[in-house]
């Protein structure tokens, strides 16, 4: 078990800010019931599930293919379990540009999602809410999926465990994946075509802890940049970029991503400047995240390491408005975590670390906050500085 390689990418709200990027007409669609035997999956840039810890404690947790461990937010842990026993300490790295000290609870942890259950000896306790916001109590990873074939239906909002004799439809495309060395990480092949026509046929780590489509790691980016393929990128520094601390990304729009023979055109991706962590690992070309897989019906065979993809109703949906800021939900406000250098938000006077009380008059605690999904082309931010509220208007990029 290699806890240092556990991956989380911060839940930054760049394009959809406080919700996912579902189009307005899709919001009004009548919600269909999930199939019998399936469990609800709420997709909001991450895949959220109702998890039962130790048979009786409900938690809202993210499924992260970049993790081999059960992680529990330290605030949730303290309020629910009190002072733990059999505790240890360890340094943990992830999407941030470094490592951070975490607590290990080796008292044994059973948990279930729907009718499926799993037990792990150890849980990692750390401040996840500074990364993910206050909507998640923790995350679970690949050990829960051992020996299973699992459907992740982003458009339908459910996860389903396939029965042993069930056949996968012929309209799915099978992609043979591989492990990262002997570590349980899913490496998936895909192609990235840049605006100058150059195509990278690469191997990418499947990381459902990352909300974006794709991020090139720094080793791959340095080579491509030297060859002149990463023109017109724009830089953003994150105060909290994931486990391990800060992160520096560069945003650019590419011609297309091709996966399983299907191409998605005009996609905004990032490349990393990190020197440490998951985004500096030269054993793969980068990370591929939820926003890409949300365009498909996905079945993962965790026995044979095969991913099956079928385009869903959101396959051709354009990316939503891009804003030059990233902020994290924190109870009664949003905290500005990053600003695009020279972007509209920075020029309008927004600062990293600012506390946003409301967006277009809507607070994060309001029941009608879904009106911000998707965000309009212009945002009026109520920013609290000291005892004053400052109004800042930000246009999309």
Located regions from the model:
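Hydrophobic h-region of N-terminal signal peptides that target proteins for export
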Residues: 11-19
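Bacterial N-terminal signal peptides that target proteins for export
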Residues: 1-7
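Pepsin/retropepsin-fold aspartyl endopeptidases
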Residues: 18-397
